[in-house]
Each structure stands twice: as structure tokens, then as C-alpha cells.
From Swiss-Prot:
This is UDP-N-acetylmuramoyl-L-alanine--L-glutamate ligase. InterPro entries: Folylpolyglutamate_synth_CS (IPR018109), Mur-like_cat_sf (IPR036565), Mur_ligase_C_dom_sf (IPR036615), Mur_ligase_cen (IPR013221), MurD (IPR005762), MurD2 (IPR043687). GO terms for cellular component: cytoplasm. Keywords: ATP-binding, Cell cycle, Cell division, Cell shape, Cell wall biogenesis/degradation, Cytoplasm, Ligase, Nucleotide-binding, Peptidoglycan synthesis. ATP binds at residues 122-128. PANTHER family: UDP-N-ACETYLMURAMOYLALANINE--D-GLUTAMATE LIGASE. SUPFAM superfamilies: MurD-like peptide ligases, catalytic domain, MurD-like peptide ligases, peptide-binding domain. NCBIfam families: murD. Pathway: Cell wall biogenesis; peptidoglycan biosynthesis. It holds the Pfam family Mur_ligase_M. One of its GO terms (biological process) is cell wall organization. Belongs to the MurCDEF family. MurD2 subfamily. Coiled coil: none annotated.
Length: 468
């Protein structure tokens, strides 16, 4: 559905975060007199009133009855379509779409293809991978957009001039389904990995996997690039796409610190500022994508050495009194915390875990702690007591020290005391979202930096967002 098709219909926007505001501006630019209603909270309603838009109404109660009055509801990604009020309204005929679907419909050609569009998704690593892809495409001399879930809504860059040669688009599981619903077919879709996440939004693990994979199953990209090492991806049948693989011995893969293409050693990653084996494996994914686009990936590989790591992702803030502080606030799953820990296997580490409870299973994390644990673990947040109870038997058996904190400030004090004069690493890798305590993971990372004695401004914006 293109924006022009909304003209004359009853249309509402649900959500007034950055995505909601981007949708409003895009619709207002194309449809300046279209009547719109925004469902938002009371504080946001006051902000909207200040716009003095006579064709814009505000409602603060998004009930099934209220939503059902509209033919079209443009929904922000964070609002689940599986909520009861959305399901009831949809059953009564309301069409729910996202800004991602509108953007893809606007850019699709007559046959549905969207040349130059590369979509990246996965449970972890997708932001760094998308940014690294844009970095290499720009290194090859191509004007490239770095947009999407990474920090710039697609509708903020609806029609940049001159248009980019490539679009590197990060998509969350909240957005992947929009691609197929738009009828558009990306040139390439890259799926890095799949672990359970966002179960509160999706409802259960099976639906999460289905929604995530809809990028390739329903989006039908020209090229589907998949991780051969992920069992949930290895068995996929995608008859409408050319399927390519990374992390496979016949293609781009990692051996130690060296990237190989088949049996040919291509590039030593020792000088690449990508902490962790998982990030170096994702470099293989980027090189496979570049090659699939017809570029010389081997020649571009050394450009990865000039990539600037993203903030809040295994970000070393510095050291104070023998203790290094690492900000991995982006970590929202237990698997992400395990990947972060693996980067510091030989160090004295105090790990801070816990946050908003989405019901994720921490048993795999606990099993790994029985085999190779940090020196200390500090639990915090809404799911902190649940994690603490799961880890307590291992701590009592002497695998690690275990502490319970009321909040991040308390956790920092416990971590410092536990490391003592010998020093080590305080690693914030919560394995859980920040909701409830912070507005987002960036705010959590900034607070961590402040508590560690660093300027919160060190949690800088992501380099290269937008079209360059």
C-alpha cells in the first residue's frame, strides 16, 4: 500500500515515538490535508497539540472499539499486532500496516523488485553488520543509505536526492513481516542467526521465528543470504530466491582470526575493531553480501580495519583504578551476554545481568556458567530475582560469586567491591531490555558510563546514519 492510497480513507497513527513521528511527517508531506488521528499517551498529546495541525486529532485510549473506527492504522513497530485490541479491530476490517511496509511499497518497481536494497536481520549482531556493510559499500565508492532499526526510520528518508545506489537496512523482528506485506522484493536479505527474543511481543518462540523468517519466506528476496551454522536456517526451502550461505567451508567463513573464501585465506582480522568471534563471523556475512552484489569482496575486505565500532556494543569506555568498564547495553538476550563474556574469557570479569522480564529462558546461560563462568555475577532488574535463583546453586558450588542488586548503581558498587584491588572488567551485558528503568538501552548505557566516571556523551551517536 502506497501513501497515496491512504487519501480519503479514515487513517490513524498508533504510537508517537520516533517511528510514529516519521510516519506523520511522511503522510503530511504527501497528503497535506488528510484527516489523521494519533493514539498516544497524555504527555505526547500535549506535544502534538503544539503542532497546531487542524487536521490532526489525538486520542489516548487505543481500545478495540476506537481502533475499529479506522480503515487504516499505521502502527509503530514496538506495538504488537497480536495485542487483543488489535486482533479484534483487525477482525472487524481495520488494516494495520507499518512504516516499513509503506516505505517498501513506495520504492517497489512494477514487478515488486527493489534494486539496491539489502535487508539485514538476526537476533544479535544486526546493527554492527548493517553498519559494516554500509561502510564497505561506501569504501567501494557507492552512495549508500544506512537506515532502519539501527537508528533512522525509513520514512525519514523517503526520497533522498540524489538517491543512493544501495540501501543497507536493519530490520527488527517487529518489522520483517512488513516487507512481505508490502509486496516488495528486496535485492538481498541477510539473516544472521535466530535465538528466542521479544517473546512478549510475538507471543511465543514459534511465532518469533516465523515473523523473523518472513523476510525471506514472504519477502522473497532475489538473493537470500543465510548462516549455514544456524540449524533454524540450514533447512529453509526458498524456491523464489537464490540462496547463498556464509559460515560454510565452501564460502566465506572464519578460521581462527582469518577470513577465508573456500580454501583461500583472504584477510587477517587482527586489526579489525570488532570484538568477539561472533562479530568476525558477521564480517564473513558482509563480505558474502558484497560479493553477491557483484563487487570484489576480497579487495574491499581490508577496508573493515577502518570501521568504527558502534556505541553500546562491547564498547570499552576506559579504565579507572585498574578496572576496565565495558558497555554492552544493547545486549537483550542471554545469548548476547554469553557472546560478550566470550570476549573476556581470560580476564577477571564482574558481569551485570538483568532488566525487563520478557520471559526468556536463562537455563542455557546457567549451563554455560557451570562450564566457564566469570569471576562474579551481579543480577538486577525485574528478572534479576529469577536469574539469581537459577544461578544460586552454581554459586554455592563455587563456580562464581553471586550478588543481587536493587538497580544499576547498586550493581556497580557490588561489582567494584567484588573485583577489589586486583581489578578486572566490569561488563554491562544485561541480556534483557531496559524498559521500566530506562527509556531505552542508550539511556542505560549512558547511566553506566556516568557511574563508571566517564562522560555520558561518550555514548555517541552511530557514525554514518543516513545517506552518504
Amino acid at each position: 500500500m502506497r501513501i497515496s492510497q491512504l487519501e480519503g480513507k479514515t487513517v490513524a497513527l498508533w504510537g508517537w515515538g520516533r517511528e510514529g513521528r516519521a510516519a506523520y511527517r511522511a503522510l503530511r508531506t504527501r497528503l497535506p490535508t488528510q484527516a489523521l488521528t494519533v493514539f498516544c499517551n497524555a504527555e505526547e498529546a500535549r506535544e502534538i497539540d503544539a503542532l497546531e495541525d487542524a487536521a490532526l486529532q489525538v486520542e489516548t485510549a487505543a481500545s478495540a472499539q476506537a481502533l475499529g473506527r479506522f480503515e487504516i492504522v499505521v502502527k509503530s513497530p514496538g506495538i504488537s499486532p497480536y495485542r487483543a485490541e488489535a486482533l479484534v479491530a483487525a477482525a472487524q476490517g481495520t488494516c494495520f500496516i507499518g512504516g516499513t511496509a509503506l516505505w517498501f511499497a513506495e520504492h517497489a518497481q512494477a514487478d515488486g523488485s527493489v534494486p539496491g536494497v539489502i535487508c539485514v536481520t538476526g537476533t544479535k549482531g544486526k546493527s554492527t553488520t548493517t553498519a559494516l556493510l554500509a561502510h564497505l559499500l561506501r569504501a567501494a565508492g557507492h552512495r549508500t543509505a544506512l537506515v532502519g532499526n539501527i537508528g533512522q526510520p525509513l520514512l525519514e528518508v523517503l526520497a533522498p536526492q540524489p538517491p543512493p545506489a544501495y540501501w543497507a537496512i536493519e530490520l527488527s523482528s517487529y518489522q520483517t513481516g512488513d516487507v512481505g506485506r508490502s509486496g516488495a522484493r528486496p535485492e538481498l536479505a541477510l539473516v544472521l542467526n535466530l535465538f528466542p527474543e521479544h517473546l512478549d511481543w510475538h507471543g511465543d518462540e514459534a511465532r518469533y521465528v516465523r515473523d523473523k523468517l518472513s523476510l525471506v519466506t514472504e519477502g522473497r528476496p532475489r538473493i537470500a543470504l543465510l548462516n549455514a551454522a544456524d540449524p533454524l536456517l540450514a533447512g529453509l526451502q526458498l524456491p523464489d530466491s537464490q540462496v547463498r550461505w556464509f559460515n560454510h567451508s565452501a564460502g566465506w567463513h572464519l578460521r581462527g582470526d582469518v577470513v577465508y573464501r573456500g580454501e583461500q585465506a583472504i584477510f587477517d582480522t587482527a586489526d579489525v575493531p570488532l570484538p568477539g568471534e561472533h562479530n568476525r563471523r558477521n564480517l564473513c556475512a558482509v563480505l558474502a553480501a558484497v560479493e553477491a552484489l557483484g563487487l570484489d569482496a576480497a579487495a574491499l575486505a581490508p577496508a573493515a580495519a577502518s570501521f568504527r565500532p558502534l556505541p553500546n556494543r562491547l564498547q570499552l569506555l576506559g579504565s579507572v583504578d585498574g578496572i576496565s568498564y565495558v558497555n554492552d547495553s544493547i545486549s537483550t538476550t542471554p545469548h548476547a551476554s554469553l557472546a560478550a563474556l566470550a570476549c573476556f574469557a581470560q580476564r577477571r570479569v564482574a558481569l551485570l545481568v538483568g532488566g525487563h522480564d520478557r520471559g526468556l529462558d536463562w537455563h542455557d546461560f546457567a549451563q554455560q556458567m557451570a562450564r566457564q563462568a566469570p569471576l562474579e555475577i551481579v543480577t538486577m532488574g525485574a528478572n534479576g530475582p529469577r536469574i539469581h535463583a537459577l544461578l544460586a546453586p552454581l554459586a554455592e558450588a563455587g563456580h562464581f560469586g553471586l550478588h543481587a542488586a536493587n538497580d544499576l548503581e547498586h550493581a556497580m558498587g557490588l561489582a567494584r567491591a567484588a573485583l577489589g584491588q586486583q581489578g578486572g572488567v566490569v561488563l554491562l551485558s544485561p541480556g534483557a531490555p531496559s524498559f521500566g528503568a530506562y527509556s531505552d538501552y542508550v539511556a542505560r548505557g549512558r547511566h553506566f558510563a556516568q557511574l563508571a566516571g566517564f562522560d555520558p556523551a561518550a555514548i555517541s551517536a552511530i557514525d554514518g546514519l543516513g545517506v552518504h
